Amino acid sequence: MSGSINKDPRDVIIAPVVSEKSYGLIDEGKYTFLVDPRSNKSEIKQAVERIFNVDVASVNTLNRSGKRRRTRFGWGQRKSTKRAIVTLKDGTIDIFGGPLA
């Protein structure tokens, strides 16, 4: 647990997920981020609270395995990722930089 205190929050949160589904969840106060696969829920919660100055109610995580793809040289695989869906107690995060439509 002491390692998570010294970890830089920008090493935990990689990028916001830009998709129709994640954009629709913003109305419910849920934000989706790509996160470091080695990070846990408490590290993700601390990172979001530090970066965006908001209170986090809960964090749900999911591991997505990379798709198997055919290449010229045989079979390859896309990178596996970890996503976190963060629910806020109150407040908003301006991650897309504009007003919601």
Swiss-Prot record:
Gene3D superfamilies cross-referenced by the UniProt entry:
3.30.70.330
**Could you give a GO molecular-function term held by this entry?**
structural constituent of ribosome
Keyword rRNA-binding among record annotations: yes
Any single GO BP term = translation
Q: Which keywords does this Swiss-Prot/TrEMBL entry list?
A: Ribonucleoprotein, Ribosomal protein, RNA-binding, rRNA-binding
* GO CC terms of this entry: ribonucleoprotein complex; ribosome
Pfam families referenced in this protein's UniProt entry, alphabetically: Ribosomal_L23
Which PANTHER family does the record associate with it?
60S RIBOSOMAL PROTEIN L23A
Q: Explain the purpose of this protein.
A: One of the early assembly proteins it binds 23S rRNA. One of the proteins that surrounds the polypeptide exit tunnel on the outside of the ribosome. Forms the main docking site for trigger factor binding to the ribosome.
Q: Quaternary state and partners of this protein?
A: Part of the 50S ribosomal subunit. Contacts protein L29, and trigger factor when it is bound to the ribosome.
Q: Which family does the UniProt entry place this protein in?
A: Belongs to the universal ribosomal protein uL23 family.
Task: State the protein's name.
Answer: Large ribosomal subunit protein uL23
Identify the species of origin. Answer: Micrococcus luteus (strain ATCC 4698 / DSM 20030 / JCM 1464 / CCM 169 / CCUG 5858 / IAM 1056 / NBRC 3333 / NCIMB 9278 / NCTC 2665 / VKM Ac-2230)
